[in-house]
Amino acid sequence: MRILVTGGAGFIGSNFVHYVLEEHDDDEVITLDALTYAGSKDNLDGVRDNPRHEFVEGDIRNRDLVTKLVSDVDAIVNFAAESHVDQSIEGAKPFVTTNVQGTQILLEAANEGNIDRFLQISTDEVYGQILDGKFSEDDPLDPRNPYAATKAGADLLAQSFETTHDLPVLITRTCNNFGPRQHPEKLIPKFIRNAAVGENLPVYGDGSNVREWIYVEDNCRALDVVLREGAVGEMYNIGSHTEKTNLEVTEAILDAVGADEDLIEFVDDRAGHDQRYALETEKIEALGWEPVYAFEEGLERTVDYYLN
């Protein structure tokens, strides 16, 4: 399979590129990335010289470039996105142009080409918050911040191309990822580094917000399964069933680094901060996937990565 991976120099995208090239000897990967704040060529160290890998620096909003690349692949996996929630609250425009309009350009190029699979990478945030129970793939979307709203818009656009153009679209919605190659502004890498140098760890509100956490390698395995075995037109939740409050995650990081809990600093909560996300995962588990890494093991690996 020849795969175009957009946003492939970012956190999850680069881990996916590494995973595919390591697990599938016959696959070829073209990585397209604009190398904005979250993308780095360093994330592709170890695969950049692989003869089955090609890196292209460019933007998914560049229609001519996208059309050219799509004409020569079997599948598209679209990770390309602006994903920093706080920045989306400060200014939504780049989130709309990349996450929605960029996806539109990819979909139109795919529809003009001969694509076997179009995997749209989404997020559990499109569902909004849930105080009890878990979200299924059939639940309505209720995004509560500009980032989530643009991802929901991209999902609906992708679904519409499957319905109206018979484009072979699949959508995944994943819980919070952590692991190697994540941007240092994100919670876990930021807190690991702060704890290591004795700086405060700013926790929103009282730290009671709950997230479901999955180690990035487990997520990459799930994405690979959906790409190859998922049913066209379907959405797949990807979760770990490991829920932790932000305060629990913070305390686990301090313990793993060997730092004192006095470094915890409670700060004003952010606007639109959803209380809890949780996902039902029966559909992806029916494809034979399940997470391998416990949170504690994944965190140990993550701490080792950032400190060494």
Label for each model-derived stretch:
Residues 1-177:
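N-terminal Rossmann-like NAD(P)+-binding domain of SDR-like oxidoreductases, especially those catalyzing
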Residues 21, 70, 107, 111, ...:
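A structural alpha-helix within SAM-dependent methyltransferase catalytic domains
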Residues 16, 39, 58, 195-308:
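C-terminal substrate-binding subdomain of Rossmann-fold SDR/epimerase-dehydratase oxidoreductases
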Residues 64-67, 86, 93, 104, ...:
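Residues in well-ordered alpha-helical elements
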Residues 41-44, 131-133, 182-185, 249-250, ...:
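Short aromatic-enriched loop/helix-cap "lid" or pocket-rim segments at secondary-structure transitions
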